[in-house]
Amino acid sequence: MSYITNNTISLSFKSLRLELILFLLLFSSCSSSVYLLDKKPHWVDQGYELHVNNLVKKANSKPNNPMHQINATKGLTIHSFGFAMENADRLIIDDYKSGKDLYASAHKSFAHAVIFGNKSLSLKYPGYIDWISGDSELIPNFNKDDIENLYWTAGAYGGAIKSSRGDPKWVILLPRIGRLLEAALSLDPNWNNGSLYVGMISYTMIRHDAPLDKELVATDFFNKAVETSKNLDASPYISLAENVCIPTQNKNEFTNLLYKALNIDMHAEPDLRLTNYINQKRAQWLLDNIDEFFY
């Protein structure tokens, strides 16, 4: 007797669809990922969430493996920023409660990402926890292989703080982002097309000990990021627009930066194609909702 029901068949096809999407996201060209994001964003969300769940399971099953820990951190952070936070930013304008609930959901994922990120580094460096918590000034002997761990752990902290919506117990941890990014910068400042410089744009503007000329410092990081990426990455433009132009209410520069981001050739650098697609979608959304940010 067969126990396959219509519901089982439906679930099987759904599972196969998600596995196919997951394959395209992870192993196919960026063009395939861009196409799916453009045409079927919900499918991509589901497919990547399945991938992240698998990464988290591996990290939990092998808690002493630094690679599994950082993979979980990276997966959770990418998914939470790329889907949950993006959707929350849009939703909260029209439906405050639903948007707030989505931020809370993203925050849980970021909090888990922070735990995995800290674990990935503490397994390699016993003094890491004392250093990151500020109890010790002795910087662990990081090397270039640790930059990815440092970067994604900083990203997880940034996401957790932003999605906490001002929760003091998370805001007080802001200096940890700086320690992680500055440690990575000391190893290879031009890593990954200037990603560390982009991270420093936002951190410079919100750090507790921000310099009086923080806008100029952030702009300097912006210029370095643009130079390092050969002006092929939209990320610096989005970051400067959101983190500097909105707080200073510089609407003209905000608009100028976002149009420059939109004019970047998404296909010029294959490694940046997916990132640029996501950032250009955000740039257009920011322009469409400009009155929400300037008064």
Describe each model-derived feature in a short phrase:
Residues 27-29:
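C-terminal motif of bacterial Sec signal peptides marking the signal peptidase cleavage site
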Residues 283:
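Acidic-aromatic/histidine active-site loop/patch
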